[in-house]
Each structure stands twice: as structure tokens, then as C-alpha cells.
């Protein structure tokens, strides 16, 4: 079986890819995983560090051939505001709830959540159901080049004991669900302190 140990960011001048792998956004955070390609073949991804891949990134096989990563269509909400200021306000409300969001000039795209849709409509937003690839904005902990190295968790579900944890949160992750997870650790709960001064 061919192995992949390196990659090229989308837009890098290169030869034409010989195959493609289609993944939703939450399965594009990878380090080591057996990937099933669109042509029916398989390849073992084995990178040194976890990477959050974007649509169009290229995996480099050991023989030099390229495999293109494609963002799969997902069930999403398209959010539009009355104007840009209103859209910024809507983005603030979504960010305050730690939701993954794809923010564009005239719209915001999120995963479907009917509770959030009701909230947004209450704020005057127009919310439409769409099926498109999802490329949410990366958090502040990701590198400027758009790829995450060394800070996030790598969950390898093909090899349940190979975990790359760069910091200890006091719990183990050993899932058998056959997919990767991108975890954001939220530190806004359980830290509500009252400071009383005499």
C-alpha cells in the first residue's frame, strides 16, 4: 500500500493529481489514517504532525504522485443580514457560541442547527438551507499558513493507541467511530469566579 508522508498547500504549482479523496470539514484534521480514495484505492496517511487540511490541498505519495483533498458537500445554513453591519453582528453572536463558521463578504455559513436558526431569525437574519463544501474559519491557535501543527489532538481511529497529545487534559480519547475529530477546548465553563473586595 502506498504511503503519504508529506503534502502541498492548495495553489502550489504541481503536476496533475492522479486521485482525489473527498472529506467533510471534521474529517480533514489528520495525522495518521487510512484514506479511501474516490477511485476505490486506499492510501496510508502518515504525517509527523496533525494537519487541518483545506479544499485543494495535495497529499504527496512516496512515489511522488499527488492526491487532491476535496471538501465534501455538507448540510449547511446560509445566513444573510440586512447589510454588512448586521452581518457582523450576526457573526459576533455565532462566535460567542463557539460555532464553526465560514465567513464571507455577504454571507455566513454554518452547520445546520435549528436552535441557532431560530435565534438568528429572531435577530432579523435570513437563513437558508444549502448543501455545499464547508470551510470554516480556523481558530487563533492555527498557524498563519492555514495548517495546524503540534497543538491540536490527533485521534487515530484505525490505530486506537497512537495518539499525539501535546498537552494533558486529564482524559484519554479512544474512539471507535471510524472518523477524525477536530476538538476545540473551551475554557469558558467552570471558571466563573466572584471576586469580593472589602
From Swiss-Prot:
Highest taxon in the source lineage: Bacteria
Residue pairs linked by disulfide bridges in the UniProt entry: none
GO molecular function, one term: nickel cation binding
Record keywords, A-Z: Chaperone, Cytoplasm, Nickel
One GO process term, biological-process aspect: urea metabolic process
Localization in the cell: Cytoplasm
Cellular compartments per GO CC: cytoplasm
Comp. bias (Basic and acidic residues): 149-198
Coiled coil location: none
Main location class: cytoplasm
UniProt KW Chaperone keyword: yes
Annotated stretches, region: Disordered: 137-198
NCBIfam families listed in its UniProt record: PRK13261.2-6 (NF009760)
Function: Involved in urease metallocenter assembly. Binds nickel. Probably functions as a nickel donor during metallocenter assembly.
Family: Belongs to the UreE family.
Protein name, UniProt field: Urease accessory protein UreE
Taxonomic source organism: Rhizobium johnstonii (strain DSM 114642 / LMG 32736 / 3841)
Gene (name only): ureE
